[in-house]
């Protein structure tokens, strides 16, 4: 595969059919998948992340699956370094790298580089998570509002991951994150590649919502609750961790904690998945170079294959 060929980013909201499209592409090209997903990186979290099955992984080489224990974190900076390395390695084997997944922050880091902000500090992060477990994220959001009003104003009081990062930056740098971003400098080693986003998007939002509900019910039937129960039984995991905050896992965790009944947890998980899909679509529609395939159309995977052929021939 030529190093000058564009790299296809197969993106789309959750439940859009990216996995099926990936398998269709693998029948046409000798590809390897670089997963762009902040949930499938975790070992022992298979059902609720819709991780490719062992049979699917046997058909198509997959990268960045099962690379972290759920007690560990994985940053956008780590993803960027891993993805750039993998792209070069895959091309050196004469194969085609395909970026596939729905974590838009990872795509942004890969395309645009990273802000020159302090690296994560595990000790400080653990301290913030402990305080949040004791006081709640709205209390930490109020603290952020005093330190960095501009950043706090654009974050929801329960946006734990972003509140945590903003407080971390304030503490480590002594400056508000908003001030640092205002005069930010992107990493000098901008990516040498051209990325083309091929986005699976629904022509009917209600139909996607129905898919989301059906898929989550299938996860429950497939053993999601037992999967979360096993994670919880370890004793070293808690709801402040990025792994446990994943959609579906945090709602089932709350149910096992006795906070809500199973039906309420199910409804909350489906609603959270819909909200995630909405955020993913909002980000995708702002991308300058984006080709769209209706994920609800007949033979959507075949249409993806046709569009990729056009991209590579361009």
Curated annotation (Swiss-Prot):
EC number(s) reported in the record: 2.5.1.75
One GO BP: tRNA modification
Pfam families, sorted: IPPT
Residue numbers marked as site, Interaction with substrate tRNA: 103, 125
This protein's record includes keyword tRNA processing: yes
UniProt keyword annotation of Transferase present: yes
Example of a GO MF term: ATP binding
Protein family: Belongs to the IPP transferase family.
Subunit structure: Monomer.
Protein's recorded name: tRNA dimethylallyltransferase
Organism: Bordetella petrii (strain ATCC BAA-461 / DSM 12804 / CCUG 43448)
Lineage, uppermost ranks: Bacteria, Pseudomonadati, Pseudomonadota, Betaproteobacteria, Burkholderiales
Gene name per UniProt: miaA
